[in-house]
UniProtKB/Swiss-Prot annotation:
It comes from Nitratidesulfovibrio vulgaris (strain ATCC 29579 / DSM 644 / CCUG 34227 / NCIMB 8303 / VKM B-1760 / Hildenborough). Disulfide bonds: none annotated. It comes from the Bacteria. InterPro entries: ATP_synth_asu-like_sf, ATP_synth_asu_C, ATP_synth_asu_C_sf, ATP_synth_F1_a_nt-bd_dom, ATP_synth_F1_asu, ATPase_a/bsu_AS, ATPase_F1/V1/A1_a/bsu_N, ATPase_F1/V1/A1_a/bsu_N_sf. Its main location: membrane. The lineage of its organism: Bacteria, Pseudomonadati, Thermodesulfobacteriota, Desulfovibrionia, Desulfovibrionales. Pfam families: ATP-synt_ab, ATP-synt_ab_C, ATP-synt_ab_N. It catalyses: ATP + H2O + 4 H(+)(in) = ADP + phosphate + 5 H(+)(out). Produces ATP from ADP in the presence of a proton gradient across the membrane. The alpha chain is a regulatory subunit. ATP binds at residues 169-176. The gene is atpA. It is a peripheral membrane protein. This is ATP synthase subunit alpha. The record marks 362 as: Required for activity. It is an enzyme of class 7 (translocase).
Length: 502
């Protein structure tokens, strides 16, 4: 085989032409101090706020403090392998998480990595965790109902799509239970649900995931978990990660519901980080921007106007109070940000009234516009009836002789309280709630013993479902009680009572 000189020179020429010099530029710094999930890094002069820095071993850190000679970094993971003098590299990326249908039905950590053992995520899109909330022009007032399946809430503190309704109460009063029921109630709707567990026990998160799987709700739910053993920066950022994933649906003309369980623990994690970053402490040692911490998160829940797709993101933040003190710093902050609150009380819980909702202190500031007409018709006077009942019950304890009208009000109130009790994991469809409340508020249950009210209600709804399903369907489709439906419902209940044996 003969090699020609011109061939060799041609090959060499091609090689020279295709030769490309690659220089990888990266700005690096050095760890000055590390501990408690916080690092101080010197030398990354051009780092941006919220930028990710890469530490040895692939650990990421998020820039929070930009100071004259160093930056304060929150480490998003275990800091035991990081030591003073370690090199740190700028990534030039802002902290982002995966979004889209790939996250549905998964359990993720705040970085968007799966922790459920079901394999990697097939995410096509990533979004930054810190995004601006929609402006005034982009919004529309809340007007569509988002039923929770809980009678006391849907009747008296209704929630609309795009609303922020706070669930507040002491520990062990059923706050998480109310929110899990709200997720279960979305089973046959178009709402995608997100549950953010902040600072919870791992066993609690596992129980929530098992419950959602058992009731077939996991297929439209994503759990973002930053448990109590995770570093404070992960607990702080988890709410924003979950919000970004949920916002994807809002921005694409769909509907989402997000539960933050709970924001008290997020505030504690943020306080820890801020103190370690040497930011000045304020009231209760929280930093001055703890209000902004929660307001910028909850303002991202919104009902978007029609030109932007008419999507919505509804938020149910949870706050844990200490001994019923709703006037503490964090509870008052979040109450002032949200559009109403559901207040759960230990005394009611211990008295067997579950869900333990205090009807007097619970309000929904915008949900009234979202409540369907049928519910307004049957439950309009309910709050007043219960308020009068509580007042009269306190008065009746003195054992004075009561006139007929007062006694009737007391009897009606006792039946309403009994009717509003509901077992866990059994959300009730709106049309069944309407039928049940109609019977109670129109006096059709006045001759049923208080102890038998729930038994009577169950039997009555079974009867309506099996024999008079057309009435329930009409309530569902018309969303109002016209004279015809009311007459048929009244007749059906009267017919049922004839054959009912308590």
């Amino acid at each position: 085989m003969q090699i020609k000189a011109e061939e060799i020179s041609k090959i060499i020429e091609e090689q020279i032409q295709s030769y490309e010099q690659r220089v990888e530029m990266s700005e690096t710094g050095t760890v000055l101090y590390v501990g408690d999930g916080i690092a101080r890094v010197h030398g990354v002069q051009n780092a941006m706020a919220m930028e990710l820095l890469e530490f040895p071993g692939g650990l990421m850190g998020m820039v929070l403090n930009l100071e004259e000679d160093n930056v304060g970094v929150a480490l998003l993971g275990d800091d035991t392998q990081i030591k003073e003098g370690d090199p740190v590299k700028r990534t030039g990326k802002i902290f982002s998480v995966p979004v889209g249908d790939a996250v549905m039905g998964r359990v993720l950590n705040p970085l968007g990595q799966p922790i459920d053992g079901l394999g990697p995520l097939d995410a096509k899109e990533f979004r930054p965790v810190e995004l601006k909330a929609p402006g005034i022009i982009a919004r529309k007032s809340v007007h569509e109902p988002m039923p929770t399946g809980i009678k006391a809430i849907d009747a008296m503190t209704p929630i609309g799509r795009g609303q922020r309704e706070l669930v507040i109460g002491d520990r062990q009063t059923g706050k998480t239970a109310v929110c899990i029921d709200a997720i279960l109630a979305q089973k046959n709707t178009d709402i995608h649900c997100f549950y953010v567990a902040i600072g919870q026990k791992k066993a609690t998160v596992a129980l929530v995931a098992d419950t959602l799987r058992k009731y077939g709700a996991m297929e439209y739910t994503t759990i973002i978990s930053a448990t109590a053993s995770e570093p404070a920066p992960l607990q702080f950022i988890s709410a924003y990660s979950g919000c970004t994933m949920a916002e994807f649906y809002r921005n694409n003309g769909k509907h989402a519901l997000i539960i933050y369980d709970d924001l008290s623990k997020q505030a504690v994690a943020y306080r820890q980080m801020s103190l370690l970053l040497r930011r000045p402490p304020g009231r209760e040692a929280y930093p001055g921007d703890v209000f902004y911490l929660h307001s910028r998160l909850l303002e991202r829940a919104a009902k978007v106007n029609d030109s932007l797709g008419a999507g919505s993101l509804t938020a149910l933040p949870i706050i844990e109070t200490q001994a019923g003190d709703v006037s503490a710093y964090i509870p008052t902050n979040v109450i002032s940000i949200t559009d109403g609150q559901v207040y759960l009380e230990p005394n009611l819980f211990n008295a067997g009234i579950r869900p333990a909702i205090n009807v007097g202190l619970s309000v929904s500031r915008v949900g009234g516009a979202a409540q369907i007409k049928a519910m307004k018709q049957v439950a309009g006077t309910m709050r007043l009836d219960l308020a009068q009942y509580r007042e009269l019950a306190a008065f009746a304890q003195f054992g004075s002789d009561l006139d007929k009208a007062t006694k009737a009000k007391l009897d009606r109130g006792a039946r309403l309280v009994e009717l509003l009790k509901q077992p866990q994991y059994e959300p009730m469809p709106t049309e069944e709630q309407v039928a049940s409340m109609y019977a109670a508020t129109r006096g059709l249950m006045d001759d049923v013993a208080v102890a038998d009210i729930r038994k009577f209600e169950t039997a009555m709804l079974d009867y309506l479902r099996s024999g008079k399903a057309d009435i329930l369907n009409d309530i569902k489709t018309k969303k109002a009680l016209d004279q015809d439906i009311e007459n048929r419902l009244k007749a059906a209940i009267a017919e049922f009572k004839k054959g009912y044996q308590a």
